[in-house]
Amino acid sequence: MHLFFLTAVAFVITSVSVDASVAKDPRGHAPNRTEVDTVNASSSTRLLRKNSTVDLVGEERAPSIVENIKALVKSSAVTPAKLQQWLDERLPAGLVFKNMNLDEPNIFSLLHEPNFAKWVQYADDLSAKSSHKESSVISTLTSLHGDKVVYDTIQAAKLYPQLSELALKLEKDQIRFWIATRKDPSVVFEALNLNWAGISIFPKPEFSAWLKYVDDVNARHPKEAPLSIIPTLKQRFSRGDEAGTDVLLKLIANGKATTEAKTVANKVESALFDFWLNSRETPDKVMDAFKYGTTTQAFLGSPRWKEWERYLSAYNARYPEKKATAIETLTRKYGDAQLLDTLIGASSKGETKTLAAKLQAQQFDRWMNLKESPLDVYNRLRSSYGDTAFFNEPQLNVWVSYMNVFVDKNPSKVDKMFLELGDTFGDMRLFRVLGEAKKFPNLESTATKLQMEKASTLFASGKSPEGIFKVLALDNVGDDILSNTLFHKWLAYLQKFNKEHPNNQESWFDMLRISYQPFGVERIIETGRKNPLTRLMAEKVENAYHNYWLDIKMEPKTAFRSLHLDESGEKLLADPKFNTWVQYLKTFNDRYPNEKTTVIDGLRDNSHDIALLRMFSAAKNDPSTEKLATDLQSALILKWQDAKKTPEELKRVFVGVPAADEMLDRYIKLLAVASSTP
C-alpha cells in the first residue's frame, strides 16, 4: 500500500512538472522528452524524501511540505481563467500572491514583474466583492516588508515613467489602508521619513500629509477614540534636558512667527490643546509645561502666559464643574507669600505691570471671598517673611493695600481692625503700619487719629527723642519727611527735651543722617526744595549736612563729588550746586586755614585741563557765567606759570582742542610780560 501511494504521488508530480515546463517555455512550444524526463527524475528523487501531500491551490499547507512541490506549483502559468476561478472562490489575495510566485525579497523588482499588475487587479476585484474595502494589496505588501519600506518603494517607483501610474495608485491605496486600519500615527510618522526632519519639520509637505492623515482617520472612525498627533511629537522631540512638550511649544511659537509655517503651527497648537483637554490635564499641570525652564515672573511676561490663559478658558468651558481661576492656580502652586513676591517684582516692570496689578486685585478678591481679615492674612504671611521682613517695603505696602480694600467692603469694621492690630503689634510696628495706612483714602482718617493719640502718649513719657524717632517709624517715611506732621511734632519734642536736659543734647540731623544715609539725605533736601512750605527746612538740613562735612574735615575735592558735580559736564558752572560747593570751600578754608585750597585746585582735582578748557569756553557763552569762566581761565593760566609749563608742551597737550588757542595766546603774553619785568 505504501509503495502504491508513492507511485501515485510521483505520477502527479510528473504531470505537474510537464505542465509547468510547457507553461514556462518562452519559445511557446512543449519541451522535448529528454527535458521532461530530467525534470521528472529530479523531482521524483526529492519527493521520495517527504511524507506528506500538498494542496495545489495553496489553501492549507503543513510545515513538512516538499519545497520542490511548492516551487513547481508557483511556477505554473496563471491564466485569466485561473484568476477568475480564484476570484469566484474568493481566494485571499495573500495566497494568490504566493501562488503567482511574487513573494520575493526585493520589493522594488516585484513592481517590474508582469504578474504583479495582474495580481493588483485581482486584489482590487476581490476587494470590490468584499464588505471590507481596504486594499489587500497594501495589506499583503506591508505584512512582508513593513509600512516604511512599502512607502519608500512607492515613492521611488513614481520616478519611473513605466511605473508612475501604478505607483500613484498604490500611494493612494496605502493611505486608504492606513486610514481603514487606524494605523498608529507614530508608524506613519516614521514611514513618511519625518523622524529625521528636525526643527524645520512644520513647513515640510510630508508633515502636512501626516496631519491630514490623522484628521482623515478620526473622520472615518467617529465612534473610536480620536487619534492625536501629540504623543508622537512629544516622543520625537524629547531630548536632552528639555521636555518634549517644551520643545514642541517652541516649535509652535517659531512656526507662528513665519508665513510658511503659521497655519501648520496653529493646527499643532490646537491639537495640543485638544490632547490636554481630552486627557483632562488640569491648568496646574499645563502651567508646568508652559513655564518649563523659566521663573514665574518671566513666565508672566511671556507670550506663553497668554496661551496658558487661553487653555484655562477652554478647560473651564469643557469642565465647568471643575472651573479654575488664574489666581487659584498660582496660589496652589506657589502659596500666598511666594506669589506676593512674584507680583511685587512683576509690578516694577513695564511689560508685566498691568498683569501684576490685575492678579494682585484677584488675590485680594480671593482673600475677601475667604472672609479673611487683614490680621488673618498677616498671620499666614508672617511664617514666610518673619516678623522683621514683613514690615519692610514693599510687602507692607501691599498688605496695607488689602486693608484699604477690606475697609472699603466693611466700613463698619475699621475701628475694630485697628484695635486688633494695636493689640497684636508693638508700638514700633504699629506706627509703621499707621504711616503706610495714611496713604490710603479709606484708612487715612482713622490712621492719622490713632497715630497722633499714640504719639502724644510717647511724647509724654519723657523718653529719648532718638528712641521715639524709631518708634514713630520716622526712619521709614521717605523723601518727603520734611512735610510730615509727625516729624515736626517730634522736632518740637526734641527741642523741649534738649532744654530740659542741657547735658544730654540730641541732634535732629544725626537722626536723619543715620536713618537715611548720605543719598537719602540728598533726596530729602531735593524734595524739600521743590515744596514752598518745606524750602526753608530743606536749606536748614543742607546747612546741617555741610556742617557735618566740616566736622569730619571732608576736603573740598571730596565734597565736590559728594554733591555729584563731577557729573555736570560742561554745564558745571551753571549748576546751583556749584555755588554751594564754592561756599563750602570758603567755609572749609576759614575753619582749617592751614589746609586752604582754591576753586581751581578743586576743579583740577576732579577734571583734566582739557575738560576745563571746554567747560570754560562753553560757560563764556552764557552771560550768567561769563565772568566766572574768565576768572577761572586766569587762575588756570597762573597754575601753568607756577608749574613752569612751556607753550610747546601745552600745545602738544591741547592738540585738537578748539578752546585752547585763546588760552595759549593769553599764556604766551603772560610769559612775555613776566620775562620783560626786571
UniProtKB/Swiss-Prot annotation:
Residues 1-20 form the signal peptide. One of its GO terms (cellular component) is extracellular region. Keywords: Host cytoplasm, Secreted, Signal, Virulence. A motif (RxLR-dEER) lies at residues 46-61. Disulfide bonds: none annotated. It is found in: Secreted; Host cytoplasm. The keyword Signal applies. The keyword Signal applies. Its main location: secreted. Induction: Expression is induced during host plant infection. Belongs to the RxLR effector family. The RxLR-dEER motif acts to carry the protein into the host cell cytoplasm through binding to cell surface phosphatidylinositol-3-phosphate. Effector that enhances P.infestans colonization of Nicotiana benthamiana leaves. This is RxLR effector protein PITG_16705. It comes from Phytophthora infestans (strain T30-4) (Potato late blight agent). The lineage of its organism: Eukaryota, Sar, Stramenopiles, Oomycota, Peronosporales.
